[in-house]
Amino acid sequence: MPKRTYAMRYVAGQPVEQIFPGSAKQLGQGLPPGAPLPTTEFLRVMVWNIFKQQRAQWLSVLKEFGRDAQLMLLQEAQTTPELVRFATSHYQAADQVPAFALPQHPSGVMTLAATHPVYCCPLREREPLLRLSKSALITVYPIHDGRLLMVVNIHAVNFSLGVDVYSKQLEPIGEQIAMHRGPVILAGDFNAWSRQRVNALQRFAQGLGLEEVEFSTDNRSRAFGKPLDFVFYRGLTLADASVLVTRASDHNPLLVEFQP
């Protein structure tokens, strides 16, 4: 029997909570009310494959480069005490999808948010060659103008022949984005290291009316000359986008600002 996919929610002063996928039907029928993401002038989103916090300085990058980010989308986030402490002291809620369990702390995508989500749907896809899982997380947050913002945090499968498994991981995400009426941010480590994968990803994004964030100084981490990390969006106005060059991970973090 396959393992059931779930997210772990970390909130300051509360026991860790296991969250099972919400019904996608809710997206078209109305979600429960919630407190909006606090925004002043901009909605700041940091996106980073944090390499299981294996290198020094990862915490200072989160604190400094990610300062004032209302949303933090991490991949390969390992729930060590240090990361959980940072998440719960700086954010209202942190939801992680354990892709696979390491000896002590599970690793997977983790979304840190300045308010609680009103919808949460964890997803996993197994790497066909390594038999390891990659995870994704769909969350929805109210924003100040009354709309609901869908946020998709993804770590795409890496080792596969062709793009069938790659596209299969995107399918359930696309179905939920298509059902959502409001603005969307889709971001993460897409492992788009081949022309086939880039084409599949661009077709996927265009089919959903998503625009790709472009970086004027593009220092994104690359494999075979192709960037691995992307941010796509709709229903928001892009204000700024930057990449920090750092040795704190094997990926450089992205910081994107939107005008909601």
UniProtKB/Swiss-Prot annotation:
CC terms in the record's Gene Ontology section: cytoplasm
GO-annotated molecular function: catalytic activity
Keyword terms of this UniProt record: Cytoplasm
Keyword Amino-acid biosynthesis tagged: no
Highest taxon, organism lineage: Bacteria
Cited NCBIfam families: PRK05421.1-1 (NF003839), PRK05421.1-2 (NF003840), PRK05421.1-3 (NF003841), PRK05421.1-4 (NF003842)
Homology family: Belongs to the UPF0294 family.
HAMAP family, sorted: UPF0294
Protein name: UPF0294 protein YE0917
Organism of this sequence: Yersinia enterocolitica serotype O:8 / biotype 1B (strain NCTC 13174 / 8081)
